[in-house]
């Protein structure tokens, strides 16, 4: 072959090689979040099912590596779904006309749990709501602060009350904004039963009064046993549960 033909063939191989590389990368990565984390389509769907679509943009490198290194992407996300009076086999969800609560688990050597409380329409009262968990027969590990998503913003909530087997986070609902979504997550050993509850304040209540409760599986949502002086402030929404055994 003459020199010019050799150059053309060499150039063609470079172009084809570059195109192949681009196609491989395009297939490998489906989404890039705000933190620069690259997810393939399976990982994106996994996080959407386990958390929500809003949460995906806030996944950090540490969170991603934790799921990857523990083999969670190869496991099935499981829950039981409660809708009205019907028990469904899709997620641990209790749903009303205005809001829902869902609890999901994925297990390897230990389990990861996510709890999602979501408003389906705008809340009229914006005061101190509560999202909590009660663990029967186990202990928590690696608890993350609850995140409140509203109209594209994300705020971590650090006002918590905790015991060895229970946790509650106080959520001050924003005065403005729709599409409210609250997510709490943590790790736990593969034993026991987890109860979760989201309690909405039906009328304005102070932060101090919102903390007047003890933890009990016999309380509201199997988590909150309110002091009589504040019991009427909360809506007594039914909770959800998941067996870890």
Task: State the predicted function of each range.
Residues 9-17:
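Sec-dependent N-terminal signal peptides
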């Amino acid at each position: 072959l003459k020199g010019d033909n050799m150059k053309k063939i060499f150039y063609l191989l470079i172009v084809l090689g570059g195109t192949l590389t681009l196609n491989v990368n395009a297939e490998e990565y489906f989404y890039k979040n705000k933190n620069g984390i690259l997810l393939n389509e399976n990982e994106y769907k996994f996080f959407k099912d386990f958390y929500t679509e809003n949460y995906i943009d806030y996944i950090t490198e540490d969170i991603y590596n934790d799921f990857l290194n523990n083999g969670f992407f190869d496991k099935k996300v499981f829950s039981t779904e409660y809708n009205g009076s019907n028990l469904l086999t899709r997620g641990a969800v209790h749903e009303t006309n205005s809001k829902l609560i869902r609890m999901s688990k994925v297990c390897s050597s230990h389990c990861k749990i996510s709890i999602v409380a979501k408003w389906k329409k705008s809340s009229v009262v914006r005061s101190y709501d509560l999202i909590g968990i009660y663990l029967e027969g186990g202990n928590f590990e690696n608890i993350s602060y609850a995140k409140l998503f509203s109209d594209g913003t994300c705020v971590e909530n650090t006002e918590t009350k905790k015991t060895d087997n229970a946790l509650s986070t106080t959520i001050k609902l924003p005065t403005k904004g729709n599409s409210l979504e609250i997510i709490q997550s943590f790790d736990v050993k593969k034993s026991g039963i987890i109860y979760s509850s989201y309690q909405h304040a039906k009328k304005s209540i102070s932060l101090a009064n919102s903390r007047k409760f003890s933890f009990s599986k016999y309380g509201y949502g199997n988590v909150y046993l309110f002091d009589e002086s504040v019991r009427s402030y909360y809506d007594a929404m039914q909770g959800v549960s998941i067996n870890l055994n």
